[in-house]
Amino acid sequence: PPLEAVFTVDEDIGMLGAAALDMSGLQGRVLLNIDSEDEGILTVSCAGGATSCLTVPVKRVPVQGNAWRVGVRGLTGGHSGVEINKGRANANKVLAAALQGLPVTLCSIAGGSKDNAIPRASEAVVVSEADDFAALFAANAAKAALPETEQHAEFYCEPAEAGEMLAESEAVLDLLNAVPNGVQAMSSDIPGLVQTSLNLGILTTDAD
């Protein structure tokens, strides 16, 4: 039978090329995927991905308290498709957990730059009326159950400046801590194969 070759672009940022592909002229019924990244290897496969954007509308109010810049950096990171099952921490999830339960109000929070990359760093500007906030954050961060892969993780807390804070901070942190992340299901047919996974890849605080 005739051999048809299909080339697409922008796979890493959302399979944009495949989504725009006109398949009406293709006759083949068997797909050989040569995107295995190893020369001489062909893969018969069926996979897909989807990007979900969660938006929390926020109201900005005047700052009450002292502003701090807090974050976590130095995580291993990796490709969320290839390395999601290697026990690597997601910086966005780690920072949200470190802030949960503290007397704090968010001014901004951001981490990650690509949908398919496990975030290595995440940072927030927060406001707290607690005089010992730096110590409270350090104590909460010390409780973070980081996997053994994160030997170089570093938490930090330093004075900052801020003009406004987010009235919905508690809801934002609750959402970040509740969002599932990582491996959700493994294949029942192929040992060690991830069937479904999630990655909280990009976190931003945008202007209205």
Predicted feature locations:
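Metal-dependent amide/peptide-bond hydrolase catalytic core
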Residues: 92-208
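Generic alpha-helical propensity signal that fires on short helical segments
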Residues: 21-25, 49-52, 88-90, 96, ...
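A residue-level signal for beta-strand positions that form part of recognition/binding surfaces
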Residues: 2, 31, 51, 67-69, ...
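Residues that cap or initiate secondary-structure elements
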Residues: 11, 38, 60-62, 76, ...
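Flexible loop/turn segments at secondary-structure boundaries
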Residues: 12-15, 40-42, 78, 113-117, ...
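Acidic/histidine-rich catalytic neighborhood of metal-dependent amide-processing enzymes
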Residues: 1-61, 106-107, 184-187, 191, ...
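Alpha-helical metal-binding/catalytic segments enriched in His/Glu/Asp
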Residues: 1-12, 68-74, 79-102, 124-129, ...
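Phosphate/diphosphate-binding glycine-rich loops and adjacent basic-rich segments that engage nucleotide
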Residues: 29-78, 83, 87, 165-171, ...
